[in-house]
Amino acid sequence: MTSLSQTGEKDEIDLRAGLTYATHDGVALLGDLYLPKGAGPFPVLVALHGGGWVQGARNAFQHWGPHLARHGYGLFAISYRLAKTGQKTFPHAVKDALAAIAFVRASAREYRLDGERVGLLGASAGANIAALAALGREAAIFAGGGAPEMHAPVKVLVGVYGVYDVLAMWQRYQEASPRENNIEKFIGAAPMENRQLYFDASPISYASIANNKIGVFLACGTEDDLVDRRTQTDAFLLALKQAGFFVRTCILAGAGHYWMNDPIDEPTSYPGFMAPRLLRFLAEKL
């Protein structure tokens, strides 16, 4: 574990890099914790990177971690188990996210965090996992021991160009590259083999009145040619509203996919457009 200080234009943040938050299947799972300076306790977001369930890294949040810390929020960017051909990671990756939530709650005093004000943030495939951890935490498929903190509700979910209906995304992969269908790698089966798994792995399945105390922020671009806005963000938004959720949206005109990792302070950047809107949402709900 590495403890560093980073100096920004106005203040400093603490970075606790390489924290082991869990060990699953003999592999230590690591996270980087970005912290504000000061006494705290601070609200915190557990953040999951994108990468189609098969790749990606937690340094995807190297801009968002410092930015949120300078505005009074902790961010715990985690690595989670990635799928390979013949090695599925559903529901394992969701359990990794739940373990990260338990870690920040159990370590709240040590890291000046508020264990009652915890949220989830995810981009693309990471938004799928984050949404499942937020909304599906009590489902039987994600149960199986663990600390009680794993299954306590979070306060907010932030999803950026996420996948909320894996069957619809499976169809999209089939049209583009049927031999490299990442949904099948993640779930371990085609829908014709096990439709229940596709229901279980879709956050839209958990958009229920019982879950509607969680505040939700959804962002996506109008020109995303990888994750279809209509069948994913728009459909999820409708289901959430029908179930009575508090939802805020940030629709970015002209934006495609992959922009979440861009610098926030870059003039006219998409993250720069989203950042103040996200902060307003967090101030209200987290």
Residue ranges, per PLM feature:
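N-terminal cap/lid segment of alpha/beta-hydrolase-fold proteins
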Residues: M1-A39
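Mobile cap/lid helix-loop segments that gate and shape the active-site cleft of serine hydrolases
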Residues: G8, A168-Y206
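C-terminal catalytic histidine-bearing segment of alpha/beta-hydrolase fold enzymes
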Residues: D32, F217-A219, D228-L286
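Short beta-strand element of the alpha/beta-hydrolase
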Residues: P41-G51
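A fold-wide structural signal in alpha/beta-hydrolase
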Residues: V44, A69-S79, G119
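Catalytic nucleophile-loop/oxyanion-hole region of alpha/beta-hydrolase
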Residues: A57-W64, F76-G115, I264-P271
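Primarily recognizes the serine-hydrolase "nucleophile elbow" in alpha/beta-hydrolase
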Residues: A102-Y173
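Acidic catalytic loop of the alpha/beta-hydrolase fold
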Residues: V166, E223-D228
